[in-house]
């Protein structure tokens, strides 16, 4: 048995290794990859490699892998990448895995500056990327976001006088706007905005016109566009697939025959034969998908869409159920917290009641002691009065007294009378004070009974709250194609639809749009003028001032007849 050849294929989020046979074709390897990752929308993708001359090349599916112009790596290195882009991501990308691979590749292109993105849009896209990666904004997701060192294009960071913390804060603020979005919906929102970027989905090739002017040819899902050498954002001339009859090349010369019979051929020159081969291969693939979109879906696509719709609906229901459960959990936890607070308040009230009761008991004992003392004083007073009366009686019985004795007796009687009056007054005061103390004692006893009753009621309420608390705790959920080298020509099938009639840039809701414009002003004020203005930033701002967006520009460059556009191209 022939010895196997080691192959490593890197997708956007995984690394796969295979051992293939020397006679394994590109298609067999491709099929093995898509089967391994569970991908069914295979028509958008291809296997990419660096050839022996250091150029990025697509693996030919109809040829043996080892017979192609590969570098002598061990294992052989390939990247599984998007080769053809859809016209509308929300309508054409069906499977979640397809959407995720597109999202990751588009994000990589923006962060690496392969695709130009304005600073304010970069921040918005970074917030959707954070939602797709971490989920809804929270303290923990914010902390994880600040650990992510690759959230914005390096160009954007270097052009502004802002710290990393300031950038993270702005992305985090936007992230908070997406709380209700699922990770899948965040990916969709990211791609809807990204597909409006001028360089999205365009493959650029260096070409020359007959005058020898260096230009860019852009091949995308809608047709061919020509750009000046220093501006990949704003195409100057466009040829939709619906206006092209035939595409072919001979050596370095590339010829496009328009449908308009009186129009001359659109001719340009590439620097290498292999570049013309790649241009033709991309034209063939893009045109095939262009025509497929304008036909009824195949049974396979219909099945995929139905399955994706069911899965999306099931996930939506699951998210809604989860949201309900989370709301219930939150309400239960809040109820639990309120009960705990009420229990704490009751415990404090009970403690105060106990202290009040203790104080009243002490006051009651003091009053009882005082009352007892007053009773003793009253008894002593009664005893003194009786003794005085006895002495007075004895005095009246004296028959014979001297004048001096009579005077002494009279003084003594007066003193006794005064003492009696004083004791009588003291007795009345004591009786009055005793009555007051008795009333206080009665009130104290009533207060004591009230406190005891309140304590018993609080204890009963406490028991009821503890039972409710246990019930609340039980309610809380537990945490949880390939060009044939001999075929240098493409006959283009026709379709009369104008692809850009209703196409408009995707705009977020007004709130986000206003916030985006505010952020644009903030970032403009923070520009580091010492770095100079980026060429593409300048072009982008000029386009905005002129009221041009991607689709308005494409409509403009397709206006007029084909002959006029070809003449314009020749005269650049």
From Swiss-Prot:
What is the recorded name of this protein? Moesin
Alphabetized UniProt keyword annotations: Cell membrane, Cell projection, Cytoplasm, Cytoskeleton, Membrane
Looking at the record's lineage, which domain of life comes first? Eukaryota
- Which PROSITE patterns does this UniProt record tie to the protein? FERM_1, FERM_2, FERM_3
Ranges of residues in domain FERM? 1-294
Q: Which GO terms describe its cellular component?
A: cell projection; cytoplasm; cytoskeleton; plasma membrane
From the Swiss-Prot or TrEMBL record, state where the protein is found.
Cell membrane; Cytoplasm, Cytoskeleton; Cell projection
Q: How does it sit in the membrane?
A: Peripheral membrane protein
Q: Where is this region: Disordered?
A: 444-508, 523-544
Its biological purpose: Probably involved in connections of major cytoskeletal structures to the plasma membrane.
Residue spans with biased composition (Basic and acidic residues)? 525-544
Q: Which Gene3D superfamilies does this one have?
A: 1.20.5.450, 1.20.80.10, 6.10.360.10, Phosphatidylinositol 3-kinase Catalytic Subunit, Chain A, domain 1 (3.10.20.90), Pleckstrin-homology domain (PH domain)/Phosphotyrosine-binding domain (PTB) (2.30.29.30)
Bias-annotated ranges (Acidic residues):
480-502
Taxonomic source organism: Lytechinus variegatus
- InterPro entries from the UniProt entry: Band_41_domain (IPR019749), ERM (IPR011174), ERM_C_dom (IPR011259), ERM_FERM_C (IPR041789), Ez/rad/moesin-like (IPR000798), FERM/acyl-CoA-bd_prot_sf (IPR014352), FERM_2 (IPR035963), FERM_central (IPR019748)
**Family matches, as PANTHER family:** MERLIN/MOESIN/EZRIN/RADIXIN
Sequence ranges of Low complexity compositional bias: 454-475
Q: Name one GO molecular function term.
A: actin binding
């Amino acid at each position: 048995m022939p010895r196997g050849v080691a192959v490593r294929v890197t997708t956007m989020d995984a690394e796969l290794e295979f051992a293939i046979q020397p006679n394994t074709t590109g298609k067999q390897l491709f099929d093995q990859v898509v089967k391994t990752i569970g991908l069914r929308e295979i028509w958008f993708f291809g296997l990419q490699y660096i050839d022996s001359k250091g150029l990025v090349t697509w693996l030919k599916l109809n040829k043996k892998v080892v017979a192609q112009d590969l570098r002598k790596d061990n294992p052989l290195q390939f990247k599984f990448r998007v080769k053809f882009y859809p016209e509308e991501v929300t309508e054409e990308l069906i499977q979640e895995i397809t959407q995720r691979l597109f999202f990751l590749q588009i994000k990589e292109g923006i962060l690496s500056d392969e695709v130009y993105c304005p600073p304010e849009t970069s921040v918005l896209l970074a917030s959707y990327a954070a939602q797709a990666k971490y989920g809804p904004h929270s303290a923990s997701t914010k902390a994880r976001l600040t650990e992510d060192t690759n959230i914005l294009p390096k160009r954007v960071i270097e052009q502004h006088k802002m710290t990393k913390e300031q950038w993270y804060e702005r992305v985090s603020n936007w992230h908070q706007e997406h709380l209700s979005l699922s990770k899948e919906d965040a990916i969709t929102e990211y791609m809807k905005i990204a597909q409006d970027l001028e360089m999205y989905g365009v493959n650029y090739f260096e070409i020359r016109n007959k005058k020898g002017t260096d230009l860019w040819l852009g091949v995308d899902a809608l047709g061919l566009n020509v750009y000046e050498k220093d501006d990949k954002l704003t195409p100057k001339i466009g040829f939709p697939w619906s206006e092209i009859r035939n595409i072919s090349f001979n050596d370095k010369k590339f010829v496009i025959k328009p449908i308009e019979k009186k129009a001359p051929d659109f001719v340009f020159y590439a620097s290498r034969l292999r570049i013309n081969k790649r241009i033709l291969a991309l034209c063939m693939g893009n045109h095939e998908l262009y025509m497929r979109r304008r036909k009824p879906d195949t049974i396979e696509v219909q099945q995929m869409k139905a399955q994706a719709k069911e899965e999306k609906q099931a996930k939506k229901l699951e998210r809604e159920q989860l949201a309900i459960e989370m709301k219930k959990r939150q309400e239960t936890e809040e109820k639990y917290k309120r009960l705990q607070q009420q229990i704490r308040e009751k415990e404090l009230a009970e403690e105060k009641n106990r202290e009040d009761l203790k104080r009243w008991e002490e006051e009651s004992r003091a009053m009882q002691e005082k009352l007892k003392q007053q009773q003793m004083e009253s008894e002593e007073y009664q005893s003194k009065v009786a003794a005085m009366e006895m002495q007075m009686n004895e005095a009246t019985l004296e028959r014979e007294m001297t004048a001096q004795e009579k005077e002494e007796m009279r003084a003594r009687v007066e003193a006794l009378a005064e003492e009696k009056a004083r004791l009588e007054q003291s007795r009345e005061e004591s009786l009055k004070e005793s009555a007051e103390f008795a009333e206080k004692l009665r009130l104290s006893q009533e207060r004591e009974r009230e406190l005891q009753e309140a304590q018993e009621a609080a204890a009963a309420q406490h028991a009821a709250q503890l039972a409710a608390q246990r019930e609340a705790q039980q309610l809380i959920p537990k945490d949880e194609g390939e060009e044939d080298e001999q075929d240098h020509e493409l006959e283009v099938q026709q379709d009369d639809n104008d692809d850009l009639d209703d196409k408009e840039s995707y705009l977020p809701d007004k709130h986000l749009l206003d916030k985006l414009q505010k952020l644009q002003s903030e970032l403009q004020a923070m520009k580091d003028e010492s770095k100079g203005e980026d060429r593409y930033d300048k072009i982008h701002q000029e386009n905005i001032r002129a009221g041009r967006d991607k689709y308005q520009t494409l409509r403009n460059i397709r206006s007029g007849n084909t002959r006029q556009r070809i003449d314009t191209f020749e005269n650049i």
